């Protein structure tokens, strides 16, 4: 699982999900990618399950890059606790993904295999995404 080894502060404010991504909107490494269409939080488990779905489909060919990192803790209070008595304990690590952000990249396979691998990974993610490729000029 992706998570920071150590952090300065255990708990943070919730990140805002408004606005478009400022950087990371173009393909940097691979020939194909998954681009976010809407804003959402992506947990470290969702990132890992999307990575596994892609790598199992492409088998030994190709290389996968993960361009997002879950660096923010999201807290949760235990079930059936009364209000107050402080903030809950950190439960998940999340990456705040905004529209336009390229989350995963892939190269070394043909487009039909890449499209199917990315489709399987998109089903694991909590927001609408789109497939982009360098050849189509969508980078």
Curated annotation (Swiss-Prot):
Binds 23S rRNA and is also seen to make contacts with the A and possibly P site tRNAs. GO terms for molecular function: rRNA binding; structural constituent of ribosome; tRNA binding. One of its GO terms (cellular component) is cytosolic large ribosomal subunit. Coiled coil: none annotated. Transmembrane segments: none annotated. Residues 1-24 are annotated as: Disordered. NCBIfam families: rplP_bact. The gene is rplP. Keywords: Ribonucleoprotein, Ribosomal protein, RNA-binding, rRNA-binding, tRNA-binding. Residues 1-20 have a biased composition (Basic residues). Pfam families: Ribosomal_L16. GO terms for biological process: translation. InterPro entries: Ribosomal_uL16 (IPR047873), Ribosomal_uL16_bact-type (IPR000114), Ribosomal_uL16_CS (IPR020798), Ribosomal_uL16_dom (IPR016180), Ribosomal_uL16_sf (IPR036920). SUPFAM superfamilies: Ribosomal protein L16p/L10e (SSF54686). Part of the 50S ribosomal subunit. Belongs to the universal ribosomal protein uL16 family. This is Large ribosomal subunit protein uL16.
């Amino acid at each position: 699982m992706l998570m920071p080894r150590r952090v300065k502060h255990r708990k943070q404010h919730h990140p805002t999900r408004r606005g478009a991504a400022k950087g990371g909107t173009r393909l940097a490494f691979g020939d194909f990618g998954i681009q976010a269409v809407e804003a959402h939080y992506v947990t470290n488990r969702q990132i890992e399950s999307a990575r596994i779905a892609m790598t199992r489909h492409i088998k030994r060919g190709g290389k996968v890059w993960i361009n997002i990192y879950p660096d923010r803790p999201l807290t949760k209070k235990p079930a059936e606790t009364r209000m107050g008595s402080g903030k809950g304990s950190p439960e998940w690590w999340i990456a705040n993904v905004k529209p336009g952000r390229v989350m995963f990249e892939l190269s070394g396979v043909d487009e039909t295999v890449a499209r199917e691998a990315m489709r399987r990974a998109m089903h694991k993610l909590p927001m609408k995404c789109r497939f982009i490729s360098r050849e189509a000029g969508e980078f």
